Every structure is written in structure tokens, then in C-alpha cells.
Amino acid sequence: MERTTNFNAGPAALPLEVLQKAQKEFIDFNESGMSVMELSHRSKEYEAVHQKAKSLLIELMGIPEDYDILFLQGGASLQFSMLPMNFLTPEKTAHFVMTGAWSEKALAETKLFGNTSITATSETDNYSYIPEVDLTDVKDGAYLHITSNNTIFGTQWQEFPNSPIPLVADMSSDILSRKIDVSKFDVIYGGAQKNLGPSGVTVVIMKKSWLQNENANVPKILKYSTHVKADSLYNTPPTFAIYMLSLVLEWLKENGGVEAVEQRNEQKAQVLYSCIDESNGFYKGHARKDSRSRMNVTFTLRDDELTKTFVQKAKDAKMIGLGGHRSVGGCRASIYNAVSLEDCEKLAAFMKKFQQENE
């Protein structure tokens, strides 16, 4: 079977080796006589999967000992509510850097629980860049929230701010795509369905000391401390999604770890951005060059009809997921960790040929 090249924004491409291993273990996991999907979350077989996923995250990301790792449900969208529910108090303000739709959603949820402030925004330029951040007025804030990569607009933080208050990052779309200093953040969270595995599990990495500030009057299942104490087993976890997460992390380790994948991601992005920049305006990048994402390459063509033709012809060539979001229009190539350099070279060759045929 010829595999389709998957440029979807999420759920996104998974490594073929991971899919093949999951296929092999789907019926009989480790000679247990059961599918991995049938394992009790209290069994020793699943416990090994659970702990393996945690230990691989610690190893690959260099997570310090003073952090907890949680596997939760509800997607990153639930974190938009859980964070202020647990950590925003009446006398404090949650500060936001607005860089796209996901920042807007996080801000909207936080407003339901307390005071918020927009520290910086690039909304007036349709979120085409990461704004400069002045942190002089946030010293008494509850936390500063950022979105590390913006899938819709194709922008990404190149350097993270040195925040005088707790720094919280939604890293759903670029976690483990590059080396970061975890110790700069009090909370990192992200849905798995872009770089970590299939949809269904949300990874939360939280500084242990931050739990001391947790609000008391919160439903038990929505308290972070509940899940820390239960090792993410307070209720039945998404066992298959966590199993797949462990396989993806294992694949990443076997392929050189984060340092190697970061180099590959830079090469992949450069192939596509060079194609855009050398097209004499046939393709126009949405993101400013100093804010370009290595995960989501966004670009427009001269009109909607040409864009539709581009997307359809790409689909005919077994490349899917290239339609842009309505906020930007045009096209978007999501090139997460599992998308290969060869996949990006195939797309670039298609783009050059399409330009020659339609100029």
C-alpha cells in the first residue's frame, strides 16, 4: 500500500514504524493474550506502559526532578479552564501574549474565573508575527500565558520570555520538536495529536511547588493535586493513547532524540520556505520571517480558485491536509516530527511544478 503524505494540522502524521509496532501488538500485547486496548489500567502490564511514557518524557525533554508529569483528558482546551480555576485568585491577574486563535480561546476561558490582561498582541496584523513583550507591569500577576506555536497563522516563538511571574505555555503543536529549557516554565501543557501521538491524552508538566498555590474550592477531578497524588490514575486514563505516546517517544529516542529531530525540522522548514521565497510572489508566506514556524508553513496564492486547484492537484498526488484555515486562507503544510524531509521535498517539487504550469 502506498502511504498518503499527511500534512494535516492534527490529528497528524504518525511514524510508520510506530503504527507497525502498534499493529503487531494490537491483538496480543507482550504475550498477555489481550489487546493493549483491553488492559486494566490497574494491571502491571499497563503500569509498565504508563511509567515508560513518563520516564521517556523526562529523558527526552530533560525535565528536572521538581516537576510532576500528568496524563489528562479533555485536550488542551480543558487546560484553558483548569489553570485559572486552580491558580487564579481575586487579587491577581492572569497575563496573556496574544498570538492567535488558541491564545484567544485560553483568554476567553480565563475571563470566566478572574482578572486578565493582554500584555502584547499581534492581532492587528492578523497574527503574522510574535510581538515584543514588555514585562515591567506583570510583577504581581498570577501567571503569564503564551502559546509557543500557532498552527493557524504559522508563527512560533523563537526565544521564550524571561518572566518575573510563573510562565505557562501551551505547547500542543511544537512540544518535542526542539530543545527547550523546561526550568523556565512553571507549567507546560499540550494535546498529543500533533507531535506526541494520537488524540485522547493531554500532557501536563508542572512545577511541584506551584501546587502549593492551588485554590481549594475546585471539583476534585479538576484539581491538579488529585491527579498528582493518583499518578494520573484517579479515573480511568486513555490507556491506548498513552501506549501510543510511549511508542512515539521510543521512536524519537531511537532516531537521535530532540537534538536530531530539531535539526531535521529546520531542514524541512527551510525546504518549503525557500520554495516560497524564491517563487517571485507566486506563493506569499503569511508569517513574518522572524516569526516563522517550523511546524506549520502558511502561504497564500493569488486567488481562491487557484488555491482550490492547488489543494486538489496535491490530493491527486497523494498529499493531503494542505488547505489553509479560513482565518488566513490559502494553504498550510503542517510538518510535525513524523513528517519526513523527503515528504517536504516532494511537496516543494510539486509547488515548483504547479507554479510553472500556472504563472
Curated annotation (Swiss-Prot):
Gene3D superfamilies: Aspartate Aminotransferase, domain 1 (3.90.1150.10), Type I PLP-dependent aspartate aminotransferase-like (Major domain) (3.40.640.10). Coiled coil: none annotated. The keyword Amino-acid biosynthesis applies. GO terms for molecular function: O-phospho-L-serine:2-oxoglutarate aminotransferase activity; pyridoxal phosphate binding. InterPro entries: Aminotrans_V_dom (IPR000192), Aminotrans_V_PyrdxlP_BS (IPR020578), Pser_aminoTfrase (IPR022278), PyrdxlP-dep_Trfase (IPR015424), PyrdxlP-dep_Trfase_major (IPR015421), PyrdxlP-dep_Trfase_small (IPR015422). It catalyses: O-phospho-L-serine + 2-oxoglutarate = 3-phosphooxypyruvate + L-glutamate; 4-(phosphooxy)-L-threonine + 2-oxoglutarate = (R)-3-hydroxy-2-oxo-4-phosphooxybutanoate + L-glutamate. GO terms for cellular component: cytoplasm. It is an enzyme of class 2 (transferase). GO terms for biological process: L-serine biosynthetic process. Pyridoxal 5'-phosphate binds at A76, S77, W102, T151, D170, Q193, N235, T236. Its main location: cytoplasm. L-glutamate binds at R42. It comes from the Bacteria. Keywords: Amino-acid biosynthesis, Aminotransferase, Cytoplasm, Pyridoxal phosphate, Serine biosynthesis, Transferase. Its cofactor is pyridoxal 5'-phosphate. It is found in: Cytoplasm. The modification N6-(pyridoxal phosphate)lysine is found at K194. Pathway: Amino-acid biosynthesis; L-serine biosynthesis; L-serine from 3-phospho-D-glycerate: step 2/3; Cofactor biosynthesis; pyridoxine 5'-phosphate biosynthesis; pyridoxine 5'-phosphate from D-erythrose 4-phosphate: step 3/5. PANTHER family: PHOSPHOSERINE AMINOTRANSFERASE. Belongs to the class-V pyridoxal-phosphate-dependent aminotransferase family. SerC subfamily. HAMAP family: SerC_aminotrans_5. NCBIfam families: PRK05355.1, serC_1. Homodimer. Catalyzes the reversible conversion of 3-phosphohydroxypyruvate to phosphoserine and of 3-hydroxy-2-oxo-4-phosphonooxybutanoate to phosphohydroxythreonine. This is Phosphoserine aminotransferase.
